[in-house]
């Protein structure tokens, strides 16, 4: 672990106690010394370097590094971890030039000679599997996506300056805040056949975790809502099990807290205007689900060695 801003005892505290996900109830987590954490009996080295090139990943035996600062998101900057001895870098955010992979959608296109990848965003991971099913079965002519997104750390607790996004500077816990998102367009990067066919926006809302996507699309091949539901249910129990979920109960956002799936289709929430125009609703735990996909992508990358 590398973090130049916090100490090992504070790392332990933050890991053990989480406002959203509760207390850590599994193996003991404690501090061995200022440069080592203990997860059960396993030692984890801790560094405090500001420059990724200076982190001794090789000495620690770290082959796969998750770049989750939000700062080093392009290939050149993320490559600094390679200079520090890492073999592969997984960027936990969209990247303008690193190849983007979404588990269940295009991860099989990964080749072992690719050293720096992006796991896309939590929001892209939600509509992408859903859009893949719909496009494969019925074809998507065009579509609009809206994510109703829980608060994140980039927002303000009270009104504050935000010169690039004036609305984004308003108090997160007291407002519904319209915002931009590249998540829908990014679906076109992992599903090239949808490139240019999807775009979208976001509403930031005063909840702390779990978000929901509204994907409204025009279909190439007519289909009833029942046929669409059946196709999604079939894939959720087959090829996309563990990635795409299906629920037909009257659930709300907190019911999906801690759900490790990327996208949980809500059969009762969607509607169809006609057999060519449909609104699909899918939930995601933007923290837990996305973190699980990062691990899944690393596992897949390792399996290609």
Curated annotation (Swiss-Prot):
Pathway membership: Carbohydrate degradation; glycolysis; pyruvate from D-glyceraldehyde 3-phosphate: step 1/5
GO terms for cellular component: cytosol
Compartments, record wording: Cytoplasm
Active-site residues, Swiss-Prot/TrEMBL: 122 (nucleophile)
Gene3D superfamilies the UniProt entry points to: Dihydrodipicolinate Reductase, domain 2, NAD(P)-binding Rossmann-like Domain
Pfam families: Gp_dh_C, Gp_dh_N
Site (Activates thiol group during catalysis): 149
GO annotation terms (biological process): glucose metabolic process; glycolytic process
Keywords annotated in UniProt: Cytoplasm, Glycolysis, NAD, Oxidoreductase
Claim: Zinc is one of the keywords in the record: no
Entry's family note: Belongs to the glyceraldehyde-3-phosphate dehydrogenase family.
Subunit structure: Homotetramer.
Protein name: Glyceraldehyde-3-phosphate dehydrogenase 2, cytosolic
Organism this protein belongs to: Hordeum vulgare (Barley)
